[in-house]
């Protein structure tokens, strides 16, 4: 399945719009990961712990989006938008939401 942030696909013609598709993935970040991330915050640098969680959540959300588009009979999703949110009282959860338009291209 073709998945793109652009509203069209070069060299392909959209022949049918199947509708808007979306998916959300929420992941919790546990105490051990928070501790490791806090050490990174103190000394500076990138937090591989949180980055890996974001990557995993984004990949899961994109896969779920493709599954939902396929259920509608689409073979592509255009206009993908990916949003990230921090949730929970202590910011202990991360949400990735993905939306796009399911289409049939040829």
Curated annotation (Swiss-Prot):
InterPro entries: UPF0145_dom_sf (IPR035439), UPF0145_YbjQ-like (IPR002765). Signal peptide: none annotated. Belongs to the UPF0145 family. This is UPF0145 protein Athe_0545.
């Amino acid at each position: 399945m073709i998945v793109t942030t652009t509203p069209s696909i070069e060299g392909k013609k959209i022949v049918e719009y199947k509708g808007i598709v979306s998916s959300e993935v929420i992941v919790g970040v546990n105490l051990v990961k928070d501790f490791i991330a806090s050490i990174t915050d103190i000394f500076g640098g990138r937090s591989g712990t949180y980055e890996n969680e974001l990557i995993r959540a984004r990949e899961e959300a994109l896969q779920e989006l493709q599954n939902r588009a396929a259920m509608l009979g689409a073979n592509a999703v255009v206009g993908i938008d990916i949003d990230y949110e921090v949730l929970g009282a202590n910011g202990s959860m991360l949400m990735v939401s993905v939306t796009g338009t399911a289409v049939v291209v040829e």
